[in-house]
Every structure is written in structure tokens, then in C-alpha cells.
Amino acid sequence: MHQIYSCSDENIEVFTTVIPSKVSSSSRRRVKSSHHLLAKNVVIESDLYPPPRPLELLPQRCERRDTGDRRWLQTGRLQTARPPGAHPTKTPSRPVGISEPKTSNLCGNRAYGKSLIPPVARISVKAPAGAEVAAKGSEHGAVLGRGSRHLKKIAEEYPALPQGAEASLPLTGSTSCGVPGILRKMWTRHKKKSEYVGATNSAFEAD
């Protein structure tokens, strides 16, 4: 039952339309039948496509994959165990054991050739350097000779000085000009000790 209201400025009109019960019952039946059909369709589809069983099927698939991997590994091992002459396409054209020493020999010859060139240059350069070293050695020898003479003089003047002090005393003045820095440091240490020893000795000397 439907009611339609039409409003105007002067009057209000109401129109009513009555729907018989037979029509409503037929429409309800159609709706119910459609619901039943949908339910049947759902049941049929569920029967056709059963739900998967993941927990039961997964181990079987893993086992199949494991067996496939094992077969592949076995075939790989068989291929590697075969002699190299069986597969000429897979083996390299030249053997590795022969090609490696050739390259090493070539590298060794190059390195040997390079190492031969610098020594010749060094020998030619070292000749004047050796003369300079000999000249320096002679100068040092002269300085040491002067130092030994100075030592003798000091030993005559101060007979009570110890041997370490005597060795450190001549390294003063002009004798330490051509001496390396490390020796100078050592001599200065001995010099300080000798000065202290000389002071103690001079205190006991008679005037």
C-alpha cells in the first residue's frame, strides 16, 4: 500500500494505491527462490573446488625438490668425474698447467730484465760515491788521530781519570764538527760525566 501526497496552496490531496496480496506473495516467492538458488550455487562451487591442505602437501613438495636437487648434484658430480676428453667443448682449448708457467716465466723474465738495468746505473753512480766515502773516511781518520793525540796529552796531565772519561774528553771543540748527531749526543753525555769526575778529582788535588 503506497500513499502519495500532493500539496498545493489551497488543498491537500492524498492518493492511495492498494496492492493486492497475491502480487506481493508472488514477489516474495521469487526472492526466496533466488536465495535458494544462490545457496545451491555456493554449495556446488565449494564441492567442485575443495580447500587446499597446506600442512599435508608442503612436506611432500619439499621432499620432491630435495630429490631433484640430489639428482642434479649426482649428475654434476658424474660430469666432473668424467675425463676432460669426453667433453671437448667444455674443456679449455689449452691446458691450464702449461699456460700458467709460461706467463710466470714471461713475468719473471721481464722482472729480471728490469732488475738488471738499475744495478748497472747504481754501479756507475756508486764509483764517485765510494771515492767520496773514502775521502770522508780519511778525514775522519785524521780527526780520530788528532783525538787520540789529545787523549794522550790529557792522560799525562790527569792520570787519575777513568778510561770512560778519557774517551769522552777529546770529543770537544773542533773534533766534533764532522761527527754524526747520534755520536754527538753520546759524547755530550760522557762529557758531562767527565766534567763531574774532573771536578771531584781537582778538589782533591794539592795546590
Swiss-Prot record:
Instruction: Write the record's keywords in alphabetical order, separated by commas.
Output: Cell membrane, Membrane, Neurogenesis, Nucleus
Superkingdom to which the source organism belongs: Eukaryota
Instruction: Provide one Gene Ontology cellular component.
Output: nucleus
Compartments it resides in: Cell membrane; Nucleus
What's the chief localization of this chain?
membrane
One BP term from GO: neurogenesis
Q: Where is this region: Disordered?
A: 65-104
The UniProt entry, under InterPro entries, shows: Vexin, Vexin_dom
Q: Which residues form a coiled coil?
A: none
Q: Does the keyword rRNA processing apply?
A: no
The Swiss-Prot or TrEMBL record describes its family as follows: Belongs to the vexin family.
Its job: Required for neurogenesis in the neural plate and retina. Strongly cooperates with neural bHLH factors to promote neurogenesis.
PANTHER family attached to this UniProt entry: VEXIN
**Can you name this protein?**
Vexin
- Origin organism of this chain? Mus musculus
